[in-house]
């Protein structure tokens, strides 16, 4: 469970962590553990202790030099790219609650539209967070498609989180939906990595007999999504990740090599006033570097941001901050991304 790895302590120094791209998270984590533990050698009587410690300093100095060169090289490359896609990330700062009545649904839609501030004449991809439509399913939202049609134009595309149901199998999913302004589904991604006791109960049938249920609404568990596939909007090749899927490097390593942007939607209200939203955000920085891709993150009561392919935060909204941020995302040529952690296992 890669949440508090030692390597995440470097998230503030993007030059150092550029090495994630060629060697991967777990190899870098092993080197970081060795480095942070290396001062212990000074408690031993050895004539090699200064030499060994100097080797570790030299390794991380070389990481810094490599990272600085890569960042400058990528900056020059990005400056020459003419083709961009306009994206808006919205952070509504909604309280964590379930909506049920038509009145509550309409109020929620109107608020998210206001924060989106759509320009009818400009092609835009809007990204809304997970959890804003908690308590309803996509079919319930479809009843209000007339509001979406009036609020957004044909030049607008929407990405948001909502629960969905497969009526043929009676399975329920935590999904990311991509739609037009009529709420016609263009793409649907069902979350693969579910949160234990939050989205599913292990040994569900047995647990129900003892009255155990999720900490979220209801007894039933969500079903796991079957596959992870990129989708393309306005020439932008997008990899979708829902909530804490962002902490798993494997999900980005085996994605489409031509990924231009990772989209991460999240409900961070669970963390409350803790360090959780900041820890959650740090993982997104690492994924952007490993994947050599831009990353757009929309988090309710978390950190919403645009991160470039070097892990630099271009724009951000803090936890409990409402509004939107916008960026012309360049269609970078993704020549190389970390595909695995073979170096770690070697």
Task: Provide a role label for each language-model segment.
Residues 1-346:
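Enzyme catalytic cores with a strong preference for nitrogen-chemistry domains
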